[in-house]
A protein has these predicted regions:
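Bacterial N-terminal signal peptides that target proteins for export
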Residues: 1-10
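Bacterial N-terminal signal peptides
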Residues: 9-19
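Serine-hydrolase catalytic core recognition
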Residues: 251, 261-263, 390, 397-723
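Beta-strand-rich domains and repeat architectures in extracellular enzymes and scaffolds
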Residues: 36-66
């Protein structure tokens, strides 16, 4: 229980950190937000147009439970639920040729659901001893390619088969087999060939001691890049496509050529290659050499892979060679690359129109880095004469546009200060009005209670201005000194937005901060160096300095808050997830009396350990080299080495199935804290089976109430009445 002396002893296993119940109900006042309400906010993803442009199917996630929905593209009516699964992801959705059937992957098999039908069912009968994945529809819509492997994790990486199945009669053809896993098959434009990757392997993450006679084992698939094959469906031997680099994105240019990109082993050179699938030999058509390291987030986030036009004439890609992430286009056969977007902003996620004349993308603004808008580059047959038109405007974050089949409309995701992520459609021209497809906010939430952030800058570690977002509670008594909380975002290469975060993993934290604002806290969220949205130089500011000036930028937010007359400089808390948890640990040990209390959610405790895990070695080495090359840099990035300096209460939260930051890191932190006599300052909760980003409702409910209780006691001097 709480005492004046400490935050209470460490409690391992499933014991409650506090004597008070962490899952009790909050609120009750009219218009007041509750944790329970905020957990009900859903997050949409993976929108797919129907071929006739009348519908959009998408995944809607509620606290880790994902299901498939279909919406009318004109916005009429409410989205209709196509599936009702209680657990397990819903992925890789695509439409059938009848325009009524939607296929999707669920728990190792292909399923199908029908618009207007009842429930979903397996697309075909599959054995329980096998799992199927990586489903992709052929260009003519008659066949599906997928990977079949053994169902057990132990055997899955040993042998896999690339299958082509005809949807009409169910006949199957074996396209390729390998003794290691096959991944990411993609069809050639003519439907005659498949390209695929070979070479993922299992990494056994550190094992925990046995609890209650059981052992929890951490295991994840790590993709080993650089092994590409192409194969003719009608028969023939797979052709190995050579790659001088560890490749990233892969796409067909035409029926006989592939394009892919990759980075050199020292992470300084980025190259684009085109390979003839008959010969297998690649040719470099473009390269960029960086002084520090290539840092545009990978193809899954920024869309920073080469994107060939549907007609095969052009390749679009992203480059930061002028200091900002911009859209470029070059001939697919090689030649001069033309910069399409220009200015002090970042353009991401390009996508070609089906007629190859336009590219849609999203970009932020020079004076509003937390907003993003959908732009369209009209090439007019010549990239050198391209014109750019923006189709969205105003405050908010609009991302990830996708063209309808007739190229007349776009579907995209939108967030702002009153709305979490939702899908909208808009006509692909200027001055069009968007149409809302979904509403992810529960009806009982009073949106007028939400606090809009103010964009500010403050002096950082070396005097450079650090951007950040200040949230001041509504009706705050500014004549008094009030407690404050600093939130440090994770990933390093991420940012805060002008409203709800675009990613579900961070949107849940934005929601919780709206609750904390109603509890009377001023909240501040810095975009420390290393963050995206502010150009290459700011993003690369972590080079050979992880845990240095970037961490100082974060904890120096407290110095800024102290300049505000309504903030109590003695009642400032700090917390963060992942990279933000790492910074929290640095702040609590490097500046032991700056913060009254801190919360570390799955933070890295030592970068030597983090580097030694094969799942993270490349990311770490690109920024700070290896421990042998730069031992002092790694020593600075090791808050566990300074845990003896801890003077204020620290709450640590971590999921046991975390593969981003292995759970063992927090176990090691607790062990070292005990050895240094700091046990009475630490409170701890582990979440069985939870991943890095907390997703499940019961986990979020416990974690948010636990953090609420922790800050209420240490920053406000009270135990929550409702608990």
């Amino acid at each position: 229980m709480f005492t004046k002396k400490s935050a209470g002893p460490i409690l391992l296993g499933l014991l409650l950190t506090f004597a008070t119940g962490a899952g009790a109900q909050e609120g009750g006042k009219s218009g007041r937000l509750t944790i329970e309400q905020l957990i009900e906010i859903k997050h949409p993803s993976d929108a797919v147009w129907s071929p006739d442009g009348k519908h959009v199917v998408f995944t809607w996630d509620r606290a880790g439970v994902a299901n498939l929905y279909v919406a009318n593209a004109d916005g009429h009516g409410q989205p209709v639920e196509l599936t009702s699964f209680a657990e397990g992801p819903v992925e890789e959705a695509f439409w059938g040729r009848d325009l009524q059937t939607v296929y999707f992957a669920h728990e190792g098999h292909l399923w199908r659901a029908t618009i207007g039908g009842v429930g979903a069912k397996a697309a075909w009968t599959a054995t329980t001893s096998s799992r199927e994945s990586d489903f992709v529809l052929s260009p003519d819509g008659t066949r599906v390619a997928f990977v079949r492997s053994r169902a057990s994790d132990e055997d899955a990486a040993r042998k896999s088969t690339l299958i082509v199945r005809t949807l009409g009669d169910g006949s199957e053809t074996v396209a390729a087999q390998d003794n290691v896993s096959i991944r990411r098959p993609i069809w050639s434009p003519d439907g005659a060939s498949l390209a695929y990757a070979v070479g993922s392997r299992t990494i056994n993450h550190d094992e925990t001691p046995a609890y209650s006679g059981k052992k929890i084992i951490y295991r994840t698939w790590e993709y080993v890049p650089g092994q590409i094959f192409a194969v003719k469906i009608a028969g023939g031997k797979p052709v190995a496509i050579g790659s001088p680099v560890e490749y990233g994105g892969l796409a067909w240019v035409d029926a006989t050529h592939l394009v892919y990109d990759g980075e050199s082993k020292d992470f300084k050179k980025y190259s684009i290659y085109v390979a003839n699938t008959a010969a297998g030999k690649p040719r470099e058509i473009h390269s960029i050499t960086e002084e520090q390291f290539w840092s545009i987030p990978d193809w899954g986030e920024a869309g920073a892979q080469p994107w060939p036009s549907p007609d095969g004439k052009w390749i679009a890609f992203l480059s930061d060679q002028d200091g900002w992430d911009h859209l470029y286009v070059m001939p697919s056969g090689g030649g001069e690359a033309v910069q399409i977007t220009k200015g002090h902003f970042e353009a991401w996620r390009p996508t070609w129109s089906h007629d190859s004349t336009r590219i849609a993308f999203d970009a932020n603004e020079p004076d509003r880095p937390g907003d993003r808008h959908i732009g369209i580059a009209n090439l007019g047959g010549n990239p050198a004469h391209a014109t750019v038109t923006y189709v969205t405007a105003g405050n908010g974050t609009n991302i990830e546009p996708h063209w309808s089949a007739d190229d007349k409309y776009l579907v995209y995701q939108h967030t702002d200060t009153r709305n979490s992520a939702d899908f909208f459609t808009i006509e692909a021209k200027g001055s069009a009005k968007p149409t809302r497809l979904s509403d992810s906010m529960p009806a009982g939430i009073d949106k007028s209670q939400f606090v809009e952030p103010q964009f500010v800058r403050f002096p950082g570690a070396d005097g450079k201005p650090v951007p950040g977002w200040l949230f001041v509670p509504k009706n705050l008594d500014r004549t008094k000194k009030n407690p404050a909380i600093i939130w440090i975002h994770g990933d390093g290469v991420n940012q805060n937005y002008d409203g709800w975060h675009v990613q579900r993993n961070y949107a849940v934290y934005y929601s919780f901060h709206q609750y904390l604002l109603q509890q009377g806290y001023v909240v501040f969220a810095p975009d420390y160096r290393g963050s995206i949205g502010y150009g290459r130089d700011w993003r690369n500011g972590v080079y050979m300095d992880v845990g240095g000036k970037d961490a100082k930028d974060a904890w120096m937010s407290a110095n800024y808050l102290k300049t505000l007359p309504y903030v109590d400089s003695d009642r400032i808390g700090v917390w963060g997830l992942s990279y933000g948890g790492f910074f929290t640990l640095i702040a609590m040990t490097d500046q032991p009396n700056l913060f009254r209390a801190g919360v570390d959610v799955a933070g890295v405790v030592d970068y030597v350990m983090y580097y030694s895990d094969p799942y993270h070695g490349g990311w770490t080495a690109s920024r700070i080299g290896t421990p042998e090359q730069n031992p002092q840099v790694y020593a600075n990035a090791s808050p566990i080495s300074h845990i003896d300096r801890l003077e204020r209460p620290l709450l640590v939260l971590h999921g046991t199935s975390d593969v981003n930051v292995p759970y063992l890191e927090s176990v090691w932190l607790i062990d070292e804290a005990l050895k240094k006599g700091k046990g009475e300052l630490l409170s701890y909760m582990m979440y069985p089976g939870e991943f890095h980003y907390f997703t499940r409702a019961h986990i979020l409910l416990d974690a948010w109430h636990r953090v609420d209780d922790f800050f209420a006691f240490h920053l406000q001097g009270r135990i929550k009445d409702a608990h």
